């Protein structure tokens, strides 16, 4: 299960799960700035890392993104952990693309 980095109030009426792009982690300058700005509006922002980025953090070695299947499974794990009732998902670049793909899959599943 991914580790979360959370900005904004736990009691917020809406939570945004925000995924990083292919080349930078969840705590990059861009992600910090965007998450902080969104949290200032009263939205809870929850960031996480895909497995390859977590491994990069632990080993210091760059590696390519995981296969699409793993990225989508990670998104499903995040959604299950956070609950979907008041959850919006998105991300930067690759993270946003995976968010839109998993959203389409979940919608088709009902």
Segment roles from a protein language model:
Residues 1-87, 101-105:
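Serine-hydrolase catalytic machinery in alpha/beta-hydrolase-like enzymes
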Residues 91-95, 99:
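Gly/Ala-rich beta-loop-alpha elbow adjacent to hydrolase catalytic centers
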Residues 108-110:
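A conserved short beta-strand
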């Amino acid at each position: 299960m991914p580790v979360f980095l959370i900005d904004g109030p736990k009691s917020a009426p809406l939570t945004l799960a925000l995924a990083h792009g292919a080349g930078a982690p969840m705590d990059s300058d861009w992600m910090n700035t965007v998450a902080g700005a969104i949290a200032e509006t009263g939205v809870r922002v929850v960031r996480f890392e895909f497995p390859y980025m977590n491994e990069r953090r632990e080993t210091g070695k760059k590696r390519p993104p995981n296969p699409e299947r793993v990225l989508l499974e990670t998104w499903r794990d995040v959604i299950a952990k956070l609950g979907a009732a008041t959850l919006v998902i998105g991300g930067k670049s690759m993270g946003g693309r995976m968010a839109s793909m998993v959203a389409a899959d979940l919608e088709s599943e009902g």
